[in-house]
From Swiss-Prot:
Stretches that traverse the bilayer: none
Role summary: Oxidative cleavage of octopine into L-arginine and pyruvate.
Name of the protein: Opine oxidase subunit A
Cofactor: [2Fe-2S] cluster
Pathway(s) where this gene product acts: Opine metabolism; octopine degradation
Cofactor note: Binds 1 [2Fe-2S] cluster per subunit.
This protein's UniProt keywords: 2Fe-2S, Iron, Iron-sulfur, Metal-binding, Oxidoreductase
Alphabetized PANTHER family for the sequence: ANAEROBIC GLYCEROL-3-PHOSPHATE DEHYDROGENASE SUBUNIT B
Lineage of producing organism: Bacteria, Pseudomonadati, Pseudomonadota, Alphaproteobacteria, Hyphomicrobiales
Amino acid sequence: MTLREVSTASDLREFYDVLISGAGPAGMTAALEASAAGARVAVLDENPRPGGQIYRDITRNRPERKSYLGPDYWKGKQLAEVFDRSTIDYAPRATVWSLEGRDETVAKVRNVVGVTVGGSARMIEADAVVLATGAQERPMPVPGWTLQRVMTAGAAQIALKAAGAMPSEPIVLAGCGPLLYLLASQLIDAGVSDLTVLDTAQSTFRMSVLRHMPEFLRSPYVLKGIRLLFKVKCQACVVSGVRSIAITGSERAEGVRFTTAGGEQAIPASSVLLHQGVIPSTNLTNAAGCELRWNDEQRAFEPVTDNEGRSSRQGIYVAGDGSGIAGAQAAEVSGRIAALAALCDLGLVSVTAVAARLKPLHKQARRFLRGRAFLDALYTPRSSFLAPLNPETVVCRCEEITVRKIREAIALRPPGPNQLKTFLRCGMGQCQGRLCAATVTEIMAEERKVSPADVGTYRLRSPVKPVRLAELAQLPHTARALKAVTGRDPVDHDTNETGHISCPDTDIASCGQVQRRRPTSAGIVA
């Protein structure tokens, strides 16, 4: 048996029992579970090889990098090798840009997925779709974050895993969260000697943190976390209690100014890595109409699911960090659980057999979730970083919208973030809000003195990722393809004499005012 790697969209089948978006820990285990039950399975992933962000390039990485990437990274190799020996259809470098859920009221009994592979687009049907899209880094807009040589900690870690590349020294690593110290440890082991960690986490001795301490002490993360903190604090310059950060430089980062209880300081920097935690990637779940809810502990929106990963839309399941941040081991278990739920709902595995498999999996999941509440409370970002105070800080990098402009627009009392778009185009650039949505929600909540749950987030529509018109032009002119592109029902369009649905210039413009070489609000690139 061997993995069936797909290089173009035409190589994909028209229908799958289970279609999975994402080839990280959750996506791989979901695919293996479904394939073992005899289901027709496809995995669509943006990366060139399976593994996701946590196990990036695990199948081809060099042994000499083992010393600094650590044992947790190499745990993923066995899973990736099992995945590689399966008979699953696997499409690397694939972009999933549309997902329409089932709607039996109009006789649409299958999910429809829009995907681009190898420069061509295609619509695929699936009885069940498992979204294992993982997490994304929470944006950390500070003055100077748009300068050259400033990147997220996650981006630096990707370069380290994929190419063994390291930022130029001296390096400043700023923010909060477990990844901050993990990356610091990896950089130290890789040979970095001039490293400063600016820890923006609030005091550990808060009641919201201490009440979760007993459970955390029983978790599998305690000793690992203590060793990590001790190592970094012994081998790098760690500054705790940082309250504000500004990156200085004309065209590229040259230094960092920061404040603590002791006052303001400035240090030189050739590279600045920012990080303040991760949040679920909800673009597809949002665009598919799945219900989202605000998680106040993780300061993020997440899809509403049951204990088996079923979303509010029939036939759509969510697994891994895309349903709530829990880590790689929990994601592996979550993928298996979601796949079993899908197989049961499709009648491919009996209810009795699924129940027997789920019991030990739920037990494992509870073990991996133990201590998560402590970490969420400990690394809750400061409000001044969630909703930046400096009025000239850029929030929307695509459209260059500052904090000042956003606060001025909020003063005009738009109902929510979606209406704010019409004032500023904030969130209408090529990233489609991935880098600004969380910050806009936090600023609006602060201005109105309400919870982010009352504010909401951007409402997304397909395409949720940038797609070229040349790729979309290869789609057959069917009703479902046209709706995936324009977001409009087929009844709104004319049908020509040959039976094809026409899409006049006005329809294309309604997708987001297409301009040459400029991304539109719908993610279309001319």
